[in-house]
Amino acid sequence: MRLLHTIIVALACLGIQPAAAQEAQPFRILFDWGKPELTRDAEATLREVTADFRRSQPAQVDIAGHSDRSGPAGVNLAASRRRAEAAKSFLIAQGIPADRIAVAAFGESRPFVPTEDGVREAQNRRVEIRFMR
């Protein structure tokens, strides 16, 4: 079941989803280079996520972690996972039930801004959060 959930999250992040699912515009938070810690701006955005969650009561919150291409692929994948987990922990602390949150990590495989290998691109060090209805 968890694998199926991860696959659904991955497909949603690619813009592919079941016809019954309705997806709102994603929230996007950025991270400093080499850091999984949430910035003040990220925390403010996650508070918006929490408020929207309470208003709209989506079935699920999908969190997708990403990284830039400034390090080895394995390190970047781990960094994207830590960033996604940081966002999840914050949302849980704000009262969103853990069982309504799914996390996926994509490392450097889905850049927001295409770059060459080794490039530090702030927009690629991100977490995207979507509601699934």
List each model region and its residues.
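Bacterial N-terminal signal peptides that target proteins for export
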Residues: M1-I8, L14
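Solvent-exposed, flexible loop/coil residues
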Residues: H5, W33-K35, A42, R110, ...
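Sec/Tat signal peptide C-region and signal peptidase I cleavage site
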Residues: Q17-A21
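Envelope-exposed proteins and targeting segments
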Residues: Q25-F27, G34, Q57-A59, P97-D99, ...
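A short small-residue
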Residues: P26-L30, G65-R69
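Periplasmic peptidoglycan-binding/anchoring modules of Gram-negative envelope and division proteins
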Residues: F31-A64, I92, I129-F131
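Periplasmic OmpA-like peptidoglycan-binding domain that tethers envelope proteins to the cell wall
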Residues: H66-R133
